[in-house]
């Protein structure tokens, strides 16, 4: 079975982390299009439906990277709740990605997914 979930989350969280702190309209538009295309490409039909439903009920907040990160954090926790997986706090999320970014910078790689893979 193809385990696409962790790769999806990694891409989504990293996109939000590296999103601009002062995005212009083009960056916001591109982020929205990226999310829509990304959700559309999910290999699981039910997952696509749930993701679009979540997006409709919880529109993206793209004022800055922190807002975008919080949206991805809440989305990930929403999915984890539905799957009876662990829900993490915002501070846990921040710690996970900050450590991941430091590892990425220091070693040129990240274990960002490893931290979330069991969630």
Curated annotation (Swiss-Prot):
Interacts with A151R. The keyword Disulfide bond applies. It is found in: Host cytoplasm; Virion. Disulfide bonds join 44-47. It comes from African swine fever virus (isolate Pig/Kenya/KEN-50/1950). Keywords: Disulfide bond, FAD, Flavoprotein, Host cytoplasm, Late protein, Oxidoreductase, Virion, Virulence. Belongs to the asfivirus B119L family. One of its GO terms (cellular component) is virion component. SUPFAM superfamilies: FAD-dependent thiol oxidase (SSF69000). This is FAD-linked sulfhydryl oxidase. It catalyses: 2 R'C(R)SH + O2 = R'C(R)S-S(R)CR' + H2O2.
């Amino acid at each position: 079975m193809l385990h696409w979930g962790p790769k999806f989350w990694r891409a989504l969280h990293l996109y939000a982390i590296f999103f601009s702190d002062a995005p212009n309209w083009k960056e916001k538009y591109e982020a929205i299009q990226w999310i829509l295309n990304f959700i559309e490409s999910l290999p699981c039909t039910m997952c696509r439906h749930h993701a679009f439903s979540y997006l409709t009920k919880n529109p993206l907040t793209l004022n800055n990277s922190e807002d975008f990160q919080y949206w991805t954090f809440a989305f990930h926790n929403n999915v984890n709740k539905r799957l009876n997986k662990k829900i993490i706090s915002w501070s846990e999320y921040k710690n996970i990605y900050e450590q991941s970014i430091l590892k990425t910078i220091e070693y040129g790689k990240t274990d960002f997914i490893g931290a979330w893979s069991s969630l």
